Amino acid sequence: MENSDDFIVITVSGPDAPGIVSSITSILSENAVKIIDIEQIVIRKLILLSMMLDLRESKGGQISLLKDLLLEAKRLNVELDFKIASYDEHLQHDNNFMYAVTCLGEKITAQVVAQISNAIYSENVNIERITQLSQGELSCIEMIVKTDKTINVQDMTGKLLSISSDFGVDIAVQKENIFRRSKRLVVMDMDS
């Protein structure tokens, strides 16, 4: 049986600067902490870094580690928050089905995002991550969604079809896996 304090999730947020990830992970390394999951994003010079940590083989204990992390966060001028996680939360991450919902169009407005996210929510599916994939004249966003049950991709695409026609955007739904990004199709019109 795992102890209830063997896993923690830390979240670092604040003004971005070089060395934040290096400083935080150096402390984790010195304490022999295993990183189970990690995600970082910087938006307009604001960093958000989250990690799920396995402390089962760490040195020094949870209190000492958290003290070191909080002091380093203060020195770096960022906020550090933590949550004690359970072993079950760690296992649940692996027992979910992931899908990618991609939206492409001239303009992807808040109304488009609201309609897509409402359709996803109506299926009791959670949006895990939203990423902008493009810059410039054409907009493209990708939502990685997670559910504890498999969904019918054709049914979900059908629900999103009305949004597609109402707002002049293209929406695709596909399973999220390692092979998804390697599929590419290039069409060249040589007649002109």
Residue ranges and their predicted role:
Residues M1-R184:
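A conserved regulatory-domain signal marking ACT and ACT-like small-molecule sensing domains
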